[in-house]
């Protein structure tokens, strides 16, 4: 909402950390509330687009790219002002085979191996230096392709840890209005 209201991606969390920023975000959401179609499963965005129930949506890029590549859907992904989220892998404290887990992490962290993910789904490799190992035809389909990294927001887990509970309460109250 804040980016739609003119806040630069780099400034979103600084603005959203203030009461005025939260009010600004919800004021922007108010302008589109009656037009929003909410989804709660990853398969829904391509279905909503295909049925023409919506003309644009947020989505996991892999779902949209799959609809384009496999189903011939006439969709276009817009990368400008995208929100990037990263998954994490952890070794639980007290794991029975931590040495094996460390070997696994070392293996998948190699740029050449990390880049292979793009052969199976269009979620980009997490290592920047892996991009040079991605097939040239796959690279433009990845959210973290160099050409797509000019205007983006990285989801800030620390911010959401600090402010998420209050923002979710405010959001749920807003939805109920």
Which residues does each PLM region occupy?
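Conserved C-terminal helix/tail region of periplasmic/extracytoplasmic solute-binding proteins
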Residues: 47, 148-177
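Mature extracytoplasmic/periplasmic domains
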Residues: 87, 92-152
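Extracytoplasmic/secreted proteins, especially bacterial periplasmic and envelope-associated proteins
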Residues: 20-27, 31, 40, 44, ...
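Ligand-binding pocket segment of bilobal, Venus flytrap-like solute-binding proteins
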Residues: 1-76
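Periplasmic-binding protein-like
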Residues: 28-31, 70-95, 137
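Sec-exported extracytoplasmic/periplasmic mature domains
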Residues: 2-7, 30-34, 50, 54, ...
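Solvent-exposed loop/turn segments at secondary-structure junctions
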Residues: 62-65, 82-84, 96, 112
